[in-house]
């Protein structure tokens, strides 16, 4: 909602990949609760700002991580990248209108940045790559999970073997 408010948008779409059934259930419940509490919908928190959120269940193709493929899927087409030019959905996006596409990782940074400031956020990471990055690691590691690390500071070796993260390969193989 922060991004919608900042940009003056009245409609947002949440695209959830088809194979993520549990995420779909949880997001649908969260949306219902947010509408009921007045955090989304008409006149949010008794203001003149209104935004509706549409959740779209995708077919489950990895390629829809590419922003124009995601837009194609939202439009009910096969989720394949669009021919370019135009290169950016900000020029011609969903239903031919200017469109902003952000992922969960990007949007999850907004509350922290708003509360603490962009200069404080830039203190994380390296000078050439400020900020943090989230890694979802599964498979044959001792502690699978989602880990937030600083750009340019944490190595993949640390991510996989450090006690603060994955703690190494399962069965030490």
Regions from the language model: what does each represent?
Residues 1-18, 170-172:
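Glycine-rich phosphate/pyrophosphate-binding loops
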Residues 24-151, 163-164, 169:
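Hydrophobic alpha-helical positions that pack around
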Residues 17-22, 152:
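Cofactor-cradling patches in redox/metallo enzymes
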Residues 153-158:
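Short, structural beta-strand-to-alpha-helix junction motif
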């Amino acid at each position: 909602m922060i991004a919608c408010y900042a940009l003056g948008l009245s409609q947002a779409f949440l695209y959830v990949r088809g194979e993520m059934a549990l995420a779909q259930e949880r997001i649908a419940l969260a949306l219902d609760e947010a509408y009921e509490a007045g955090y989304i919908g008409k006149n949010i928190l008794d203001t003149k700002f209104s935004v509706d959120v549409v959740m779209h269940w995708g077919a489950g193709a990895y390629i829809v991580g590419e922003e124009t493929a995601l837009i194609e899927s939202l439009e009910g087409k096969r989720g394949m990248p669009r021919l370019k030019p135009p290169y950016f959905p900000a020029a011609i996006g969903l239903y031919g209108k200017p469109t902003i596409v952000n992922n969960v990782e990007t949007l999850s940074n907004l509350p922290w940045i708003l509360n603490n400031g962009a200069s404080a956020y830039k203190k994380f990471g390296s000078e050439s790559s400020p900020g943090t990055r989230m890694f979802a690691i599964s498979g044959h590691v001792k502690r699978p999970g989602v880990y937030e690390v600083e750009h340019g500071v944490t190595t993949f070796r640390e991510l996989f073997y450090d006690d603060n993260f994955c703690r190494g390969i399962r069965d030490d193989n």
